[in-house]
């Protein structure tokens, strides 16, 4: 089962991400706590990890993320913050993903 390079693990740790685990199909599950307290999980392939994170960042849709949580709140979930906080948090998540992708791409160039 492939695992992440130490250089990538160091970047994740510095940015307060943790590895939750590896899957049998070659993926890694990452966990990060957003400023609003969301337990944000990302699952990507270990192979070409920097590109996988870049693609995830490019595909992340803050509006879709906000809508998911607004719907959860409408369906009775109690721990969802208000719309303004959700909007700010989605922006913060996008920023974190972009910065993480950039740092990983830079590390990849140096290898």
Which residues does each predicted region cover?
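Long amphipathic alpha-helices with heptad-repeat character
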Residues: 5, 83-86, 90-100, 104
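Compositionally biased amphipathic helical and low-complexity segments enriched in hydrophobic
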Residues: 10-13, 55, 87, 105
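Negatively charged, low-complexity tracts enriched in Asp/Glu with abundant Ser/Thr
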Residues: 1-37, 74-77, 107-111
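Intrinsically disordered, low-complexity regulatory segments enriched in Ser/Thr/Pro
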Residues: 36-88
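Generic local-structure boundary detector
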Residues: 23, 41-43, 53-55, 97, ...
């Amino acid at each position: 089962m492939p695992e992440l390079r130490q250089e990538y693990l160091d970047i994740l740790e510095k940015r307060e991400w943790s590895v939750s685990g590896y899957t049998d199909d070659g993926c890694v599950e990452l966990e990060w706590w957003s400023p609003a307290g969301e337990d944000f999980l990302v699952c990507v392939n270990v192979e070409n990890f920097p590109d996988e994170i870049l693609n995830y960042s490019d595909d992340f849709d803050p509006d879709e993320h906000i809508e998911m949580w607004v719907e959860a709140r409408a369906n009775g979930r109690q721990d969802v913050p208000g719309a303004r906080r959700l909007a700010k948090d989605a922006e913060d998540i996008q920023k974190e993903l972009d910065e993480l992708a950039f740092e990983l791409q830079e590390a990849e160039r140096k290898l």
